[in-house]
């Protein structure tokens, strides 16, 4: 029997078992049950003394145990690390057992199962039937997984089954209550193993009149009285709420491969199961494949107070306790972990994921026709957009929400007619954002037409789950994660990096016959992070070349052989004499290149120096782990280039991405005290070496010159750690034309990247030169495993401060005719606590600055004068006209209790609001507010007690005739950001004092 592993899960009854859900080549699903064991590693001496004898035991052979406690010394008399070799045993017990002096107990039992039996969680195997005992049709027991799964075979494709769902609930206040608010709609996107896709929506007929029900039937809706009458081929079905819930129960109890929702763990599934029990007394029941265990659907929460989210709220995750092999997947929590977005509402995520440039085909009376295909945007974008459009009801044109009037869809494109004001441009960005509907009002005015409209919105949201599932490649990422992390598919996204690293680490330790132990308590001290340079200036009319180190921290660990067991010791000094003596003797006792000495910042205030010494003769655990990850990533990237099918490409892309993420997480885990890889000295040395590497690259580029086909680097090409046999001559021959004459200047850098200005505004030449620079830096400047990559040309770069800049980006693969990408890093455009007015204005002024830089007609003083004069005109005009809507000035904030002071004004604001409003603001909820003052207040220069002008804005708020927006608060914040874009501080201070009566705050460089 040839099978592919698709999920692993456990039963937690009196007799615990591990189950595999697998699929054969013919699409048949097969479950295999294994005994569940707890694993313990002991020495031969302890094994022989155990009473009663262990249930099962496997010899592990001789293994080396290394004590990895850090040795701290004030001199070079460092004791050798404790190390011993002994025969070890792996013990398997069906129940937990207290065994003294067991080691390697930090690893997961499931990882032990896979590794000890040589099984890959997502592998394909030809099973040996003699080790299988049939339990029932489609379920077998296996007591010897090692022999049963001995023959691994090449991967083969299999079909999967899915259920994507969404619900709508009646509500009359802010949020539906399961006790009083019925479910009005449930929509499903059902995909079976044959690939057949069914879309259907159930409508609660109890919310309609009998006349409306009859009209719905006349218009083609199916009306049913019981579960048995359900026809899944019909798109719209009317039934009672009880039947609606019974159908939900039947569907959720089926063994799909995936049941996918958006925030369904916290709401949809919980609401369905609670409503079902309330109305019928029934529960949703899952049964294990052997039919021996039944469990009720229950949502349980994990609160990780050690990982607090925004506003001090504990990181809470929600989980479904099923035992039938279905993976219940919540896209909301997945996207929260994998994407950094302004908002995690479904409409915001959709807008980010599904967009396409559309061409205006026709302009009518308050309607416009757009067409999208491979000629209007990058190949494939229109096809994806068209797929979402099949169920879409609204399309966002730039920021205007437009209702779909008509749509034509074909394989690689679409034509859509939108209810839209007349727009003048020829092309616009189309996206799927928020449907322009007010559900509260719809329920208030509820009738048949509204019910049918809501059915369309509901099925679109269910289908959006499918579209997002495919967009994020969740299935291939799940399989890739299972293989890489040595975890079941159902657990891949449930753990943090400190846990997922344990599988690969255990695998490596067993391969190298190594056990790492600690006898002392782990200590945590702060240490300096990556090097961030101060920007040399604010605005750049010349192009700036961006060079990034490839996987800097992983390669630092490999270069320095940084690992807890390769650390010889840490030498500290409390006075200058000690430091001088230690420095003189250090290189004699620990000469490079076998050893590397890393100067770090002292861990305690009474110390003046700290030097970590690492032995580079034998590769350590962390470097070996990283080398494996990077090699595997390179292998999958190569396979990705050679792949022919879309399935192969998706798998290989997910695999290379997974290895990239896990390799980059290792540095963080070295400094995380609860991690199995914790090594304070290694983490600290990693950032120290990283800083020296970025400083070294900056030193050779800052002041470099290109002329006559020769590149003169600014400094000798000397290894910053020790002398080697490389040629250090800074003059290097290039393959560039001899008439090229350019100078280079380093203007900024951050951790692993260097921003180098070239005295040219020609994009094509800049890219050509940068690619040659990349080649020369990698071949002549860098050494060992360090490499850099030319990432992009930044044109019209505007540096606000460290980590804050705006620019037009030309990627390394583009040219001057390419459309550049606008980049806003760390600026107000990407923040949620900034008003739309602020974002719109700052975008306008950055664009204007960018154009001025591009034209090059003005010096920095003229630019400053022109910008400030224009800004004053715009602000005065807005203040006098007061024409912009309140929506542009709304801000949002999360309500929480994480305030130092009990009488915090934010808390007071919400408390007072809740006293006077039936729709209260709950903990963890975001609310909108604005600064409002009396209408007769003149322009206020000095702003004091501005918190007292905060007003919560809800659906019912209307700005009174005796009120105005307190514009000055917003204007001051906007002006503060704009003056930080300009170079002339004197002019900026003068302008700010005249407008607001105080000096501006300039960002730290």
Curated annotation (Swiss-Prot):
Q: Could you state one GO biological process linked to this protein?
A: viral DNA genome replication
Q: What is the lineage of its organism?
A: Viruses, Varidnaviria, Bamfordvirae, Nucleocytoviricota, Pokkesviricetes
Q: How does it assemble?
A: Interacts with OPG148. Component of the Uracil-DNA glycosylase(UDG)-OPG148-polymerase complex; OPG148 and OPG116/UDG form a heterodimeric processivity factor that associates with OPG071 to form the processive polymerase holoenzyme.
Q: Which InterPro entries match?
A: DNA-dir_DNA_pol_B, DNA-dir_DNA_pol_B_CS, DNA-dir_DNA_pol_B_exonuc, DNA-dir_DNA_pol_B_multi_dom, DNA-dir_DNA_pol_B_vir_insert, DNA/RNA_pol_sf, DNA_pol_palm_dom_sf, DNA_pol_type-B
What is the protein named? DNA polymerase
* Reaction equation(s) it catalyzes: DNA(n) + a 2'-deoxyribonucleoside 5'-triphosphate = DNA(n+1) + diphosphate
* Native source organism of the sequence: Variola virus (isolate Human/India/Ind3/1967)
This molecule's function is given as: Catalyzes DNA synthesis. Acquires processivity by associating with a heterodimeric processivity factor comprised of the viral OPG148 and OPG116 proteins, thereby forming the DNA polymerase holoenzyme. Displays 3'- to 5' exonuclease activity. Might participate in viral DNA recombination. Does not perform OPG116/D4synthesis across an abasic site.
MF terms (GO), sorted A to Z: DNA binding; DNA-directed DNA polymerase activity; hydrolase activity; nucleotide binding
For this protein, the Enzyme Commission number is 2.7.7.7, 3.1.11.-
Q: Which family does it belong to?
A: Belongs to the DNA polymerase type-B family.
Concerning SUPFAM superfamilies, the annotation shows: DNA/RNA polymerases (SSF56672), Ribonuclease H-like (SSF53098)
Induction, per UniProt: Expressed in the early phase of the viral replicative cycle.
Q: Which UniProt keywords apply?
A: DNA recombination, DNA replication, DNA-binding, DNA-directed DNA polymerase, Early protein, Hydrolase, Multifunctional enzyme, Nucleotidyltransferase, Transferase, Viral DNA replication
């Amino acid at each position: 029997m040839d099978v592919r592993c698709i999920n692993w899960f456990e039963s937690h009854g009196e007799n615990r078992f591990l189950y595999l859900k697998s699929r054969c080549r013919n699409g048949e699903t097969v479950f295999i049950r294994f005994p569940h064991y707890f694993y313990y590693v002991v020495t031969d001496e302890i094994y022989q003394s155990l009473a009663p004898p262990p249930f099962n035991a496997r010899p592990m052979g001789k293994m080396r145990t290394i004590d990895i406690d850090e040795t701290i010394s004030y001199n070079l008399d460092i004791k050798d690390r404790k190390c011993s070799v002994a025969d070890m045993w792996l013990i398997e017990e069906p129940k937990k057992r207290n065994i003294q002096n067991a080691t390697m107990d930090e690893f997961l039992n499931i990882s032990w199962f896979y590794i000890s039996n040589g099984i890959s969680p997502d592998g394909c195997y030809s099973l040996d039937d003699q080790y299988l005992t049939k339990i029932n049709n489609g379920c077998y027991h296996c007591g010897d997984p090692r022999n049963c799964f001995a023959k691994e075979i090449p991967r083969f494709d299999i079909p999967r089954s899915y259920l994507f769902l969404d619900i709508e609930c009646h509500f009359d206040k802010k949020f539906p209550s399961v006790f009083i608010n019925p479910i009005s709609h449930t929509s499903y996107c059902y995909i079976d193993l044959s690939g057949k896709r069914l879309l259907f929506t159930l409508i609660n007929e109890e919310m309609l009149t009998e006349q409306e029900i009859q009209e719905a039937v006349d218009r083609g809706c199916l009306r049913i009285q019981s579960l048995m009458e359900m026809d899944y081929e019909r798109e719209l079905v009317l039934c009672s709420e009880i039947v609606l819930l019974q159908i939900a129960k039947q569907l959720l109890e089926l063994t799909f491969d995936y049941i996918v929702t958006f925030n369904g763990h916290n709401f949809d599934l919980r609401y369905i199961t609670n409503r079902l029990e309330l109305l019928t007394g029934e529960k949703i029941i899952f049964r294990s494949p052997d039919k021996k265990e039944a469990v009720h659907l229950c949502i349980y929460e994990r609160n990780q107070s050690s990982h607090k989210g925004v506003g001090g709220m504990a990181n809470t995750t929600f989980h479904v306790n099923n035992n039938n092999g279905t993976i219940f997947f919540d896209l909301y929590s997945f996207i929260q972990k994998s994407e950094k977005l302004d908002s995690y509402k479904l409409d915001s995520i959709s807008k980010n994921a599904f967009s396409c440039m559309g061409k205006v085909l026709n302009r009518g009376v308050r309607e416009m026709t757009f067409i999208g295909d491979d000629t209007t945007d990058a190949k494939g974008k229109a096809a994806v957009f068209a797929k979402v459009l099949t169920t879409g009801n609204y399309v966002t044109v730039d920021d205007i929400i437009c209702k779909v009037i008509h749509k034509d869809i074909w394989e690689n494109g679409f034509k859509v007619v939108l209810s839209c004001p007349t727009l003048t441009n020829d092309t616009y960005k189309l996206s799927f954002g928020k449907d322009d509907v007010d559900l509260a009002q719809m329920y208030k005015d509820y009738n048949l037409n509204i019910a049918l409209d809501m059915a369309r919105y509901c099925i679109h949201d269910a289908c959006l789950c499918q579209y997002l599932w495919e967009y994020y490649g969740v299935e291939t990422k799940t399989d890739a994660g299972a293989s890489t992390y040595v975890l079941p598919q159902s657990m891949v996204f449930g753990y943090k990096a400190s846990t997922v690293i344990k599988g690969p680490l255990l695998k490596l330790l067993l391969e190298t016959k190594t056990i790492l132990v600690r006898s002392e308590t782990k200590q945590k001290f702060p240490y300096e992070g990556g090097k961030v340079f101060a920007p040399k200036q604010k605005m750049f009319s010349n192009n700036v070349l961006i060079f990034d180190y490839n996987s800097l921290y992983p390669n630092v660990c490999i270069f320095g052989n940084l690992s807890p067991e390769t650390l010889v010791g840490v030498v500290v000094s409390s006075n200058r004499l000690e430091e001088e003596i230690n420095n003189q003797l250090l290189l004699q006792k620990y000469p490079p290149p076998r050893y590397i000495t890393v100067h770090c910042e002292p861990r305690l205030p009474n110390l003046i120096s700290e030097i970590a010494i690492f032995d580079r003769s034998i590769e350590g655990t962390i470097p070996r782990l990283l080398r494996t990850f990077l090699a595997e990533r390179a292998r999958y990237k190569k396979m990705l280039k050679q792949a022919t099918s879309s399935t192969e490409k998706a798998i290989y892309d997910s695999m290379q991405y997974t290895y990239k993420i896990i390799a980059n997480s290792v540095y963080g885990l070295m400094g995380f005290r609860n991690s199995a890889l914790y090594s304070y000295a290694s983490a600290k040395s990693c950032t120290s070496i990283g800083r020296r590497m970025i400083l070294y690259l900056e030193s050779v580029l800052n002041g470099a010159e290109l002329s006559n086909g020769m590149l003169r680097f600014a400094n000798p090409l000397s290894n910053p750690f020790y002398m080697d046999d490389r040629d250090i001559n800074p003059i290097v021959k290039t393959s560039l034309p001899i008439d090229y004459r350019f100078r280079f200047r380093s203007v900024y850098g951050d951790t692993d990247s260097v921003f180098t200005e070239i005295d040219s505004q020609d994009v094509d030449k800049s890219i050509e030169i940068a690619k040659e620079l990349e080649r020369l830096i990698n071949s002549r400047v860098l050494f060992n495993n360090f490499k850099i990559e030319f990432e992009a040309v930044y044109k019209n770069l505007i540096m606000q401060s460290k980590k804050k800049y705006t620019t037009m980006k030309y990627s390394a693969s583009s040219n001057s005719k390419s459309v550049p990408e606008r980049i806003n890093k760390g600026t107000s455009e990407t923040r949620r606590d900034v008003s739309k007015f602020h974002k719109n204005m700052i975008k306008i002024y950055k664009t204007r600055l960018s154009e001025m830089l591009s034209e090059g007609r003005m010096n920095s003083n003229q630019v400053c004068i022109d910008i400030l004069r224009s800004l004053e005109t715009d602000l005065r005009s807005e203040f006098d006209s007061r024409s912009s809507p309140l929506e542009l000035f709304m801000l949002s904030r999360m309500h929480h209790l994480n305030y130092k002071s009990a009488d915090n004004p934010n808390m007071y604001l919400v408390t007072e609001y809740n006293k006077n409003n039936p729709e209260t603001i709950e903990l963890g909820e975001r609310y909108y507010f604005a600064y409002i003052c009396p209408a007769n207040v003149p322009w206020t220069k000095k702003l004091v007690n501005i918190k007292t002008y905060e007003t919560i804005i809800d659906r019912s708020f209307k700005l009174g005739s005796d009120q105005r927006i307190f514009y000055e608060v917003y204007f001051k914040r906007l002006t503060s950001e704009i003056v930080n874009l300009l170079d002339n501080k004197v002019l900026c201070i003068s302008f700010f004092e005249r407008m607001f009566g105080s000096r501006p705050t300039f960002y730290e460089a």
